[in-house]
């Protein structure tokens, strides 16, 4: 990686970027390396194990841990991350049937299952704008989640995994779909 702390310390001591030099990396201090990956941290909620605990997420600490997922696209890392949190989910889509009695309420009040309520809303035809209005989540993230839901429709056109063309399968993998989801 890029030795950020080293460069910051040298700059604080009065060195200019061209004085800092190579620092043992192929790039000089004033040329940051290209980063072709993303990382997401997702809290792990296990609220079902605690009797009487309100499922609504607020300022009090209810997380029992977290996961980190690394990949080349947001869609990939969110799907991988949701598989790792230990709720028995297969990713953002393709999960066991979750029933949300009042989907609008589930979207507007953050809970441990809110991300899956977003998936359900997108599958039911909610617009990104409507979900943004209810959740206050930035549309950039919602559009990325919509990409996943939209691609399930592309995959669903094929009866077996063997029928899926290589380019469609490659895109599904780029979007973080597991073999189970496909």
Region spans (language model):
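ATP-dependent carboxylate activation and anion-phosphoryl transfer catalytic cores
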Residues: 1-167, 172-176
